[in-house]
Amino acid sequence: MTESIKKILVTCALPYANGPIHLGHMLEHIQADIWVRYQRMRGHEVYFICADDAHGTAIMLKAEKSGINPEKMIEEINQQHQNDFSGFLISYDHYYSTHSDENRELSVAIYQRLKAKGHIKKRAISQLYDPEKKLFLPDRFVKGTCPKCQAPNQYGDNCEACGSTYSSTELIAPKSEVSGATPVIRESEHFFFDLPAFTGMLTQWIHSGALQEQVANKMQTWLTSGLRQWDITRDTPYFGFEIPDAPDKYFYVWLDAPIGYMGSFKNFCDKKENVSFDEFWQTDTKTELYHFIGKDIVYFHSLFWPAVLEGSDFRKPTNLFVHGYITVNGAKMSKSRGTFIEASDYLKHLDPDCLRYYYAAKLSSHIDDIDLNLEDFVQRVNADLVNKVVNLAARNASFINKKFAGILSKELADSELYFTFVQAGLRIANAYHARETSKAIREIMALADLANRYVDEQAPWVLAKKEVDEAKLQSVCSMGIHLFRILMTYLKPVLPALSERSEAFLNTELTWDSINEPLLNHEIKPFKALFNRIDNDKIVAMLKC
């Protein structure tokens, strides 16, 4: 590598610890994992961190309904989440929880730094209170009639019918979603983070050129309309961290959740002698920090989070990498339509590399939604991975193994074609780095077409019938194996399981920097099936789960 080695910290948004991982979640974790694996292949020092977001009223109420304490519930869900991510070959260096000593200490320290600098304000607010559950109701736990358009059955913060936003205390005829009781209005003293004080810094960040254009434009809209102080308080009963010197007051989950990136990394660093937490989080750091997130949480990550970090003397993210939503067969994931697919149900029936490939073939650096069309999914995986890539190895390896004891030719049959494949590596590398994964896949599949055309034109099955052409047969089939090796090297960030099986077959590690040299006079292993075609019956079985 000519590029200097970078130190990079990468995170995904923290999954909420009140339910299973589904294929919508997996888009982000697969996108980030492909980028991380590519950066590692190029020699960079990358740490890939995540955790469960384990606080909040929703978790407290679900645990109560399940008859267990919240700590036990989040521990069980954390293990399920880790199993799902491991099943999809997400290469986390560390996966933790926001309900940790490290996160508590960092949350308190950040709050105290903000308070010392005058960035924490205090005032009384009016909230809806459930008199039966003795609970202040979050916006999502109360429904009523929209005060703007009179649409019934709307949540306490915004109307899905007319798009208006409002305070829950403005709802007409509100009802608690927890108990069904009619809530009453009560006052409570809350702490606020003075977000407007950071308008200048956030404006500079928007115009730095680092952020995705769509993100910068959205931030500009929010800044133009004016920022408001952010309520970081929740009242007891609540599952989270208590605010120092404020009895019965807790940090709002959206304060300690992003601090969970730091808490998870701190726990990781404390177990490693050669990784420094401060090096990655101090304000003058030379390291890079990237957050992969969905478009639904841009507001928190582009405004609140960098302002909190700035105000507490920690570094800000180098960039936010934002993606869109997943639809299935053109519509929102739905339990009633059978398209709400849990990660664990997918893994019971299908290879994780199939979904990794399909998402990769559609992902870009933009914030567009991606459709998981199950018919197209089957067709594309079978056509690209089975027919084009794996078949390239199979149709050539049979001759090499049978006639030449697994030894590749001493000479390169077509050096011009070989170096066409090598030179394509720069375009593919640039696409991976820029998160234009679909562009990388298009480039790779165009090469796969070239490789198969070469084999078709050389017709080794015809050469095999002419004993005088054995040297040419070995050379042609070896060329097919060389091209398969390059293709699999380029696909390695996307297809870790298939890459590992391919490395065993090729009897060599797939590294980006080694493809300049073909495997001349090299012994390959006997060919075994590398990848199975997707059967429609497996899709049907998965949807029935």
UniProtKB/Swiss-Prot annotation:
**Cofactor remark from the record:** Binds 1 zinc ion per subunit.
According to its record, what are the GO cellular component terms? cytosol
Q: Which GO terms describe its molecular function?
A: ATP binding; metal ion binding; methionine-tRNA ligase activity
GO biological process terms, alphabetically, are: methionyl-tRNA aminoacylation
Instruction: List the cofactors.
Output: Zn(2+)
Motif, 'KMSKS' region: chain positions: 332-336
Q: What class of enzyme is it?
A: ligase
Query: Record's superkingdom?
Result: Bacteria
Q: Which InterPro entries match?
A: aa-tRNA-synth_I_CS, Anticodon_Met, Met-tRNA_ligase_1, Met-tRNA_synth, Methionyl/Leucyl_tRNA_Synth, MetRS_core, MetRS_Zn, Rossmann-like_a/b/a_fold
Q: Where is the protein found, in the record's own terms?
A: Cytoplasm
Q: Which Pfam families match?
A: Anticodon_3, tRNA-synt_1g
Among CDD domains, the record links this protein to: Anticodon_Ia_Met, MetRS_core
Keywords in alphabetical order, please.
Aminoacyl-tRNA synthetase, ATP-binding, Cytoplasm, Ligase, Metal-binding, Nucleotide-binding, Protein biosynthesis, Zinc
Q: Where does ATP bind?
A: 335
The reactions it catalyses are: tRNA(Met) + L-methionine + ATP = L-methionyl-tRNA(Met) + AMP + diphosphate
Residues spanned by motif 'HIGH' region: 15-25
Main subcellular localisation: cytoplasm
Which E.C. number(s) belong to this protein? 6.1.1.10
Q: Which PANTHER family match?
A: METHIONINE--TRNA LIGASE (PTHR45765), METHIONINE--TRNA LIGASE, CYTOPLASMIC (PTHR45765:SF1)
Against HAMAP family, the record matches this protein to: Met_tRNA_synth_type1
- The protein's assembly and partners: Monomer.
Q: What is this protein called?
A: Methionine--tRNA ligase
The organism encoding this protein is Hamiltonella defensa subsp. Acyrthosiphon pisum (strain 5AT)
Q: What is the lineage of its organism?
A: Bacteria, Pseudomonadati, Pseudomonadota, Gammaproteobacteria, Enterobacterales
